[in-house]
A protein has these predicted regions:
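N-terminal, positively charged regions that mediate nucleic acid binding
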Residues: 1
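GHKL-type ATPase core
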Residues: 4-14, 18-19, 30-153
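ATPase catalytic-site recognition across NTP-hydrolyzing enzymes
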Residues: 21-25
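Intrinsic-disorder/low-complexity loop/linker signature
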Residues: 134, 165-166
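Conserved, well-structured core domains of diverse proteins
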Residues: 157-158
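A short catalytic or substrate-binding loop motif that flags glycine-/basic-rich loops and adjacent residues
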Residues: 161-163
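Short beta-strand elements
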Residues: 167-176
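Single conserved hydrophobic/aromatic residue that forms the stacking wall/gate
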Residues: 178-181, 185-187
Length: 187
């Protein structure tokens, strides 16, 4: 069923084609380990994609780079096919998966949870645009947008926003509000 499958396409550099199969199937490979990349990375150095691969009845990864696309397909983490073709598509990565129904009985995806998580990525990566089911998710102001989107009461003062190369802080005092259903009180 179409609602039980996921596909993701980005337009970054693409996973290096020589390491594509290992990057999605072998632990401790494919991560962004240098300090500059790690500051901006939101994830666990590829552990998640390897787990998704192992727990999927169908998993496909494509890396588009330099006029070539390398396509690898898997089932339950086992490599089924691996080929490289010419392409005119933009650089980037495509991943498709269908969770293994023998492991995940009667599973379903929760669109509101997925949208919230994707929105959180945009707060942490200002300017990143994500298209989810035809809806564009974008944060131009990072943590300021996070506060504005989640506060149920007006702050006592304008949001204070500090952003440096390695840190971003946004805060404002409020008298009484709920933030993501958690009640907060002040004296």
């Amino acid at each position: 069923e179409e609602n039980l499958r996921v596909s993701v396409r980005d337009y970054g550099r693409g996973i290096p084609q020589g390491k594509l199969v290992e990057a999605v199937s072998v632990l401790n490979t494919g991560g962004k380990y240098d300090s500059k990349a790690f500051k901006k990375s939101v994830g666990l150095n590829g552990v998640g994609v390897k787990a998704v691969n192992a727990l999927s009845s169908r998993f496909e990864v494509r890396s588009y780079r330099d006029g070539k696309v390398r396509i690898a397909t898997f089932s339950k983490g086992n490599l089924l096919t691996d080929e490289t073709l010419d392409t005119e598509e933009e650089s980037g990565t495509y991943i498709f998966f269908e969770p293994d129904a023998t492991l995940f009985l009667n599973y379903s995806f929760r669109p509101e949870f997925i949208e919230t998580m994707l929105r959180n990525y945009t707060y942490l990566n200002t300017g990143l645009a994500i298209i989810y089911n035809g809806q564009r998710i974008l944060s131009r102001n990072g943590l300021v947008d996070l506060l504005n989107d989640n506060m149920t009461a007006t702050g006592l003062y304008p949001i204070i926003h500090l952003k440096g190369e390695d840190i971003e802080i946004a805060f404002t005092p409020v008298s009484y509000t709920h933030l993501r259903a958690h009640e907060t009180l002040s004296d």
